[in-house]
UniProtKB/Swiss-Prot annotation:
Subcellular location: Cell membrane
Annotated family: Belongs to the chloride channel (TC 2.A.49) family.
Segments traversing the membrane: 10-30, 54-74, 99-119, 120-140, 149-169, 186-206, 223-243, 258-278, 300-320, 322-342, 343-363, 371-391
Membrane topology of this protein: Multi-pass membrane protein
Protein name from the UniProt record: Putative ion-transport protein YfeO
Predominant subcellular localization, coarse grouping: membrane
Molecular function per GO: chloride transmembrane transporter activity; monoatomic ion channel activity
Organism: Escherichia coli O127:H6 (strain E2348/69 / EPEC)
Taxonomic superkingdom: Bacteria
Claim: DNA repair is one of the keywords in the record: no
Length: 418
């Protein structure tokens, strides 16, 4: 016979697996549709019209029209495509299901149109809303927070293709007690994350790791170098933190989201022309291209880091529906490669991983997620002790500093962005 603790853990196992699978399928569906639309906008259509896909007019035109299209969705869809991600944490309160169609359409348009945001925030929002709405009907005795955690864990597992990220993130959220051990509380979320990761793996494998030279034995000077790199990345990120609420307030003085997002798309187009096609989109495929291109110089990497960080701020301030983690990782990779080119004595594995750690820490203020992203992009077990040590001064630097979020105006309804 099972112990009562085991029966309690098994109670949510089936719902957790179902939520994990569903979370992954929703992510896959959105990414597939966005990929088809992206291919149409950036490959087939310019080819049919005889226009180069990296033509300045095409880049500016597509991003401007993308902004207008997203603005129309936000303006006229029921629920106004959910909350403004610039004002929300990664894992927030559930939104009304009526806002989900508009949110999904706005996300797909942004991903396909080249906006410098990832899918993580809207996908988590969609899955939380569905899990809470359906779960409350099927199992009303389970509280909303449990459904929120399961949906978040399932989505994180699906996004990163592993349960490790969910385990790290929720280990600090689900604080155990003497009565309920931590791993008892982690059981159902990890089931959801595992189901999400395995389902994603059936269709595609998220490819985060970069072909960077292997790092051998750790030396004391490497710790100092890594801490300096992380501090530089944090400084760059804090510039974005300072700019975001000010640009957001300035742009949203115009009350019509069609105008706001149209102007935001136009600015993103100009940034895309300066940075080139590699500076567009969410950044994961593009950072692979950036590493593979041996022709980039120190100034090229610096330009890409600045352009991508500016595009991230503009996209978030404009109200595009998307997350900030994936483009932040791109910025970290560009900064790391730039610093390695500038000081070749410091291994690229250190500069890239520590830059990712610093910039993701600024964006998420989550130490575990920052460590995970740094370790998964530069997969090298020798780096793990160094990253854990570098995290300490990085965390001290950010203690008490403002987060990369905008304080929502009190007069603005929580899910109304008109």
């Amino acid at each position: 016979m099972l112990h009562p603790r085991a029966r309690t853990m098994l109670l949510l196992s089936l719902p957790a697996v179902a939520i994990g699978i569903t979370s992954s399928l929703i992510l896959i569906m959105v990414m597939k549709i966005a990929s088809v639309l992206q291919n149409l906008l950036w490959q087939r259509l310019p080819g049919t019209l005889g226009i180069a896909q990296d033509s300045p007019l095409w880049i500016i035109g597509v991003l401007t029209l993308t902004g207008i299209a997203v603005g129309l969705v936000i303006r006229f869809s029921q629920g106004h495509a959910g909350p403004d991600p610039a004002c929300e944490p990664l894992i927030g309160a559930p939104i009304p299901p009526s806002a989900l169609p508009g949110l999904i359409v706005a996300l797909i348009l942004g991903l396909a149109g080249g906006v410098s945001l990832g899918p993580e925030h809207p996908i988590i929002t969609v899955n939380i809303a569905l899990a809470v709405a359906i779960g409350a009907r099927l199992l009303p005795r389970v509280n909303r927070m449990e459904w929120t955690i399961l949906a978040s864990a399932g989505t994180i597992g699906a996004l990163f293709g592993t349960t490790v990220a969910a385990a790290l993130i929720f280990s600090q959220t689900l604080n155990g007690s003497n009565e309920v051990p931590l791993w008892d509380r982690l059981f159902a979320p990890l089931m959801a994350a595992a189901a999400g990761a395995l389902t994603t793996g059936l269709f595609f494998h998220p490819h985060f790791s970069l072909p960077i030279a292997h790092y051998g034995q750790m030396e004391m000077t490497d710790i100092l170098s890594g801490a300096i790199v992380a501090a530089i990345a944090i400084a760059a990120g804090m510039v974005a933190v300072w700019c975001l609420p000010r640009l957001h307030a300035m742009m949203h003085q115009m009350k019509n989201p069609v105008f706001v997002l149209g102007i935001g798309g136009f600015i993103l187009g100009i940034l895309g022309v300066i940075g080139g096609p590699v500076s567009l989109f969410k950044g994961l495929d593009e950072m692979q291209q950036m590493v593979a291109n041996q022709a980039f110089s120190t100034s090229d990497y610096f330009l890409l880091a600045v352009i991508k960080l500016a595009a991230l701020v503009v996209a978030a301030a404009s109200g595009f529906r998307g997350g900030r983690i994936f483009p932040a990782v791109f910025v970290g990779v560009a900064l790391g490669l730039m610093l390695h080119e500038h000081v070749p004595a410091v291994p690229a594995a250190i500069t890239v991983s520590c830059a990712i750690l610093g910039i993701v820490l600024v964006v998420t203020r989550d130490g575990w997620l920052s460590l995970f992203m740094a370790a998964v992009v530069v997969p090298n077990t020798t780096l793990l002790p160094l990253l854990c040590i570098v995290m300490l001064p990085a965390w001290l630097l950010l203690a008490g500093k403002p987060m990369m979020m905008v304080n929502r105006p009190k007069q603005q309804p929580p899910h109304d962005n008109v």
